[in-house]
């Protein structure tokens, strides 16, 4: 899942020469050290860096430059991600203010030069892109810190930084002079014939964003636009911050309902909470209060035979606070107002204008066709729900499919699924614990093997310096190294044990060629803020992958004493999929290297950006990949295909229903941003009524009671484009069958995929990329026929 926040139009002292030499020497030492090892040794080293805490600690100590490093920074270290300014929360705020001044100075110089010389016009797009990078360098790292950093002081500083930068970025969105200068040079053949294709692509992208930001409006309306956009951003931050909040953290049931629960262990646990529950405060002896934190509510949903108890717990667990729904209603209404101001039928029309899908009508057609296929297909949704229903009423022969879909409620799902799984297990031998073949290090090492095979790219661990990460005990740094060119592609910072964040991919720095040749920035200046390539001509992309995996067993000995190396973090098949998925985003960022940052890596259209990550899930599900990668963490025995097949068969019990549920979420995203909000009156909009009405129509596990939609983060981050996952899944299926089906380790297929899709970032029409990858010219038009082809089952 991509988390970004800051495209330009959406969104000091120098390090000593001595330090520079030491950093370069350290890099050369590590690179040479790696090259002396065999590939097998290097993969084992990579595995141990993640799986063995003591080994990692020694590696970090032995890999760091001399101790004089810290004294050069007054003991504070090199700063987060090697950005000198980010040594403290106040440093982040100072960096934002310095960057703001740097941006204003750049704008002033650009505007003076574009009006007075041809050279100023020729350099204008490069400098506009540089301006974007100056701002993104602040807002992207601030967003990462706000969401992921363990220190509240850093989080507070990130929030202040976001507010400082976002207002200025929105002012740039509606800067008429910036826009007119760009518009005029893009229609001047004397200039465009001397620009690179990438410069023109970025220029057109920025022009579109200007125009979509209401540049044609009168000054008062433009000012309102900026104010509303900023308010939407702040509402979105509040929405995401409260995504896990509940309306209440207790669910009360009657004592008679409690008595019907047969699980004595759960009853005992619930009873133990009563002294701290609302019952003790209200002296409510007639009810029992179930805590909604911890494992108890989930145990009830999967094991409790009392439907009324499951119903109450499920609704309570899915209810959002009223304030959260108010926040959702507010930003959806503001979005509708913005779309109306810009002359669009709806926010969805506004969002999709330049996406692959083109318009909401195409999206709804895609979703309806998908849902119809899932309902009607053999072994589809109806068959899956029928299997569940047989454990509810015993015999469903007298009921129609529609009646069965209506009868199986959302609070029945986990309970009936547990019954189905239990019955399935009775018919089979006990399954071996497959997670013992999937340590974190084994999977990362396996990914390096895969990337070397298909891309000729290695993942090489690098020791971090003091202050470079937010948790030196658990964050690992990888150099993504291209063997073909013998160059670094960029850096990954991986934190698999974050207590705060769902699996996420954060862009910290984008690829960009420095503008040293035109004199608008210097290497000395940039060296303090970013990590540069070997020739110091490009800033290297920096990506952070953060997951919330459980720490290895035996870690309770203290934060600074290290984790028990005897048993590493072991992964389920779902968690393996997640890491493959997020690494798909990361490799897109690394391979999609461009000279201009606005369209580098994952900065492509939103309904294309999930393709690389979704495609990686095809690799993670293929036994030819997993069985070559997986090894038992103790015995080093490989995983057998038979064992994997047995476990995978249990994962597909509700596979079609899962896809249907995702299509419901995508449909909700569309109807909350459609033209009805404008036509029926923005003032009277009620997202809960819309949600319940849609659920009633779509039927499968229909939720007509809770306010779960307040827990759906993509309603803000992916507003009107959540369908992207489903579209990109269809595209990924085509790519897999067209390139990798015969051999998922194929270098030829990997090279074709790199050359046709990954390397372009967002600088090429995605439909043209697909036409190239699949050898089908019809796709290059990107019309309704192309959408139809992609929607066809392979």
From Swiss-Prot:
Cofactor(s), by name: Zn(2+)
Cofactor remark: Binds 1 zinc ion.
Molecular functions (GO terms): metal ion binding; metalloendopeptidase activity
Protein's UniProt keywords contain Transit peptide: yes
Keyword field: Hydrolase, Metal-binding, Metalloprotease, Mitochondrion, Protease, Transit peptide, Zinc
GO cellular component: mitochondrial matrix
GO biological process: intracellular iron ion homeostasis; peptide metabolic process; protein processing involved in protein targeting to mitochondrion; protein stabilization
EC number: 3.4.24.59
Primary localisation category: mitochondrion
Intrachain disulfide bonds: none
Binding site for Zn(2+): 581, 585, 588
Reaction catalyzed: Release of an N-terminal octapeptide as second stage of processing of some proteins imported into the mitochondrion
Localization terms from the record: Mitochondrion matrix
Transit peptide: 1-39
Family the UniProt entry places it in: Belongs to the peptidase M3 family.
Protein's job: Cleaves proteins, imported into the mitochondrion, to their mature size. While most mitochondrial precursor proteins are processed to the mature form in one step by mitochondrial processing peptidase (MPP), the sequential cleavage by MIP of an octapeptide after initial processing by MPP is a required step for a subgroup of nuclear-encoded precursor proteins destined for the matrix or the inner membrane.
PANTHER family the UniProt entry points to: MITOCHONDRIAL INTERMEDIATE PEPTIDASE (PTHR11804:SF79), PROTEASE M3 THIMET OLIGOPEPTIDASE-RELATED (PTHR11804)
Protein name: Mitochondrial intermediate peptidase
Organism of origin: Debaryomyces hansenii (strain ATCC 36239 / CBS 767 / BCRC 21394 / JCM 1990 / NBRC 0083 / IGC 2968) (Yeast)
Native organism taxonomy: Eukaryota, Fungi, Dikarya, Ascomycota, Saccharomycotina
